[in-house]
Curated annotation (Swiss-Prot):
Belongs to the UPF0434 family. Pfam families: Trm112p. InterPro entries: Trm112-like. This is UPF0434 protein BAV2101. It comes from Bordetella avium (strain 197N). Transmembrane segments: none annotated.
Amino acid sequence: MESRLLDILVCPLCKGRLEFLRAQDELVCHADRLAFPVRDGIPVMLESAARPLDAPADTAHAS
């Protein structure tokens, strides 16, 4: 994920900073405790696509 993109992306709920977790391919909002998936290099910034941070990463984002 490009660092320029990370500089402008914010959490769609609280408008807070996001952290990119490369190993999980997720953008994490620590304030809302949500992880947004990155699919094929494209962040999916929908609340409905996010998983709670307390949910296991391997079962998240199943559609």
